[in-house]
């Protein structure tokens, strides 16, 4: 899912 990557990677990263 693109949303998971965006939230996980952007928020978490």
UniProtKB/Swiss-Prot annotation:
<comment type="function">
    <text>Molecular calcium-binding chaperone promoting folding, oligomeric assembly and quality control in the ER via the calreticulin/calnexin cycle. This lectin may interact transiently with almost all of the monoglucosylated glycoproteins that are synthesized in the ER.</text>
</comment>
<keyword id="KW-0479">Metal-binding</keyword>
<dbReference type="GO" id="GO:0005788">
    <property type="term" value="C:endoplasmic reticulum lumen"/>
</dbReference>
<keyword id="KW-0256">Endoplasmic reticulum</keyword>
<keyword id="KW-0106">Calcium</keyword>
<comment type="similarity">
    <text>Belongs to the calreticulin family.</text>
</comment>
<dbReference type="GO" id="GO:0046872">
    <property type="term" value="F:metal ion binding"/>
</dbReference>
<keyword id="KW-0862">Zinc</keyword>
<dbReference type="GO" id="GO:0030246">
    <property type="term" value="F:carbohydrate binding"/>
</dbReference>
<keyword id="KW-0430">Lectin</keyword>
<keyword id="KW-0143">Chaperone</keyword>
<protein>
    <recommendedName>
        <fullName>Calreticulin</fullName>
    </recommendedName>
</protein>
